[in-house]
Amino acid sequence: MEPQLGPEAAALRPGWLALLLWVSALSCSFSLPASSLSSLVPQVRTSYNFGRTFLGLDKCNACIGTSICKKFFKEEIRSDNWLASHLGLPPDSLLSYPANYSDDSKIWRPVEIFRLVSKYQNEISDRRICASASAPKTCSIERVLRKTERFQKWLQAKRLTPDLVQGLASPLLRCPSQRLLDRVVRRYAEVADAGSIFMDHFTDRDKLRLLYTLAVNSHPILLQIFPGAEGWPLPKYLGSCGRFLVSTSTRPLQEFYDAPPDQAADLAYQLLGVLESLRSNDLNYFFYFTHIDAGMFGVFNNGHLFIRDASAVGVIDKQEGSQEANRAGENKDIFSCLVSGCQAQLPSCESISEKQSLVLVCQKLLPRLLQGRFPSPVQDDIDSILVQCGDSIRPDPEVLGAASQLKDILRPLRTCDSRFAYRYPDCKYNDKF
């Protein structure tokens, strides 16, 4: 039989129970495994360790950088779907993830978190690195890359020159000029003191990260050296952590394939305008796409169209000229093979025509936006011009002329209202918008 408590003891019972529960919880916090503990109390270190592997920090300095890692660890970059490690992280199979970003934990704005390449491709690349040194599959990737002849040249270099990037598969470096490479170094955001064309302020770690990024995917470099704040059609680069980069958020163009006719006309008009600015600009750089799909373009919430993925963008310097890279297989090494087969042949700089990007867009994207949207005879004119614009056999002037005609047709098909905030209300008072 349970002993009976006196009045005073009975009165104290709720307090004793609370104290016992507190002591019990405290003792459990020293004895529970980490997996159970994380569900009771926020554990910064536990979340940090889990995040390192997912973000690829365990592979650094064979990574993009670490400039935005603190935001991840302070949970100032987060999503409703993966707020902390014990709630589960996104599937590894994705190349990008929507998230929210804050500088003060009060005001949040949408961002996208990108992998440079898929997790599967990263694993293949890492195995290639180990195999290049006849090392086990779980070798120190950084140690192997540091011992390469190319990186040893980088360590001695004071300036990034075309010979140091020859053989890399990135379209950005296919036809490099010294002016372009100086711009890469001067605007590289993953070092503390950017601004100089010389790499005196680069540590060994900084040089390896830059080389690795250029070898795997030049998308984050293009965001840094041609920023949207200066009028380039690219989203803002917010920083990198491990093998991920963070940039401002856009909706992929394919989400607008069923848009109303006036919105489709506006996006097509913008798309042609973007290609025109890449072909002709004040800095005399000619940008071209090696291939195109709808996921490479995105639309901000104000209706403005930008290049969402610049990994397939090449650059030719029309002012200074370019030095042909990778002649006769020269300077091919493990850095040349991280994302493609070492035997992959790249087109020569001279084979890149002014019409190349236009032809690709007119073949693959504009028909999905414009076909069957407008009444005759406007639709007939659009369809006819798309055939001319997408004909790779036609001379450059004919393709460029067809694109200009298409812009003239699309301009009056656009409407002026708040859906197009990037040009509203200016469009009410100025035909330019």
Swiss-Prot record:
Cited InterPro entries: DIPK2A/B, FAM69_kinase_dom
Glycosylated residue positions: N100
Keyword Secreted appears in the UniProt entry: yes
Swiss-Prot/TrEMBL keywords: Autism, Autism spectrum disorder, Glycoprotein, Secreted, Signal
Signal peptide: 1-31
Subcellular location: Secreted
Keyword Signal carried by entry: yes
Gene Ontology CC terms: extracellular region
Family recorded in the similarity comment: Belongs to the DIPK family.
Disease: Genetic variations in CXorf36 may be associated with susceptibility to autism.
Protein name: Divergent protein kinase domain 2B
The species this protein was found in: Homo sapiens
